[in-house]
Amino acid sequence: MKILYAASEATPFAKSGGLADVAGSLPKALVKDGVDARVIMPLYGDLKYREDLEYVTNYSVPVGWRSQYCGLFKAEVNGVTYYFLDNEYYFKRRGLYGFYDDGERFAFFSRAVLETLFYIDFTPDIINCNDWQTALVPVYLNLYYRHLDKFNRIKTIFTIHNIAYQGKYGTDILEDTCGIGRRDQHIVEYDGCANFMKGAFETADKITTVSPTYAQEILDPWFSYGLDALLREKQYKPVSYTHLRAHETLRHL
């Protein structure tokens, strides 16, 4: 079993909230259980232990109508391989989020996660994406990579840590920045906006949450932050990490 855990933050390298704790602990637990679990995340400007990273290679990543540089670094901590995606324009800043171009930054990161698989000796059975920052990974996988032999058997899990943050932007971002043509924009559009998380709901093979309580909470209109209609429409039944076993999950995908 091979799992690539895509996250915008992970301990011990970068943290702004609980996502980093899960991204730092779950892959480690899976490795102890015999799973080849690896983590991929941005190489932020204030990333801890930057001096210990090993340079691997660099390549170009499509971002809308243009291409952007991506450097690949790696490190191993507690038996887990971490990959770091470098682009100084997007990530060499103080802090992780809250910038005017966050949509472009994480559209780049989501596309770069998939492009990276061409340059490493690792093809995951599952890509586990987390929150809106990686929500375009399953969208891009289905639109642009699924026909390739390396990608056609990869399954995706999307984990909701905080449904309040969905990656909502004007629809003009979709073609120019995200590279999603008009024919496919309905996948990511919701309620007059581009909504990255909605795109993951439409394209991921399985949806999980971080606890049984939260899995039930987000089915309530009061706690769904506008996504309750979509959840009802898709008869959405999220499962929690408490109930998630990697081997069982792959068997049912």
What residue ranges belong to the model's regions?
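An aromatic- and histidine-rich active-site surface loop
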Residues: 102, 108-109, 127-146, 154-174, ...
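N-terminal subdomain of nucleotide-sugar transferases
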Residues: 1-74, 206, 211, 215-216
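Conserved small/polar residues in nucleotide/adenosyl-binding loops
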Residues: 242-252
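Short secondary-structure boundary/capping segments
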Residues: 19-22, 47, 53-57, 100, ...
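Acceptor-binding helix/loop patch of EC 2.4 sugar-transfer enzymes
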Residues: 90-101, 150-194, 212-219, 225, ...
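Segments forming glycine/polar-rich beta-alpha architectures that bind adenosine-containing cofactors
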Residues: 229-234
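Conserved nucleotide-sugar donor-binding subdomain of glycosyltransferases
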Residues: 77-132, 176-199
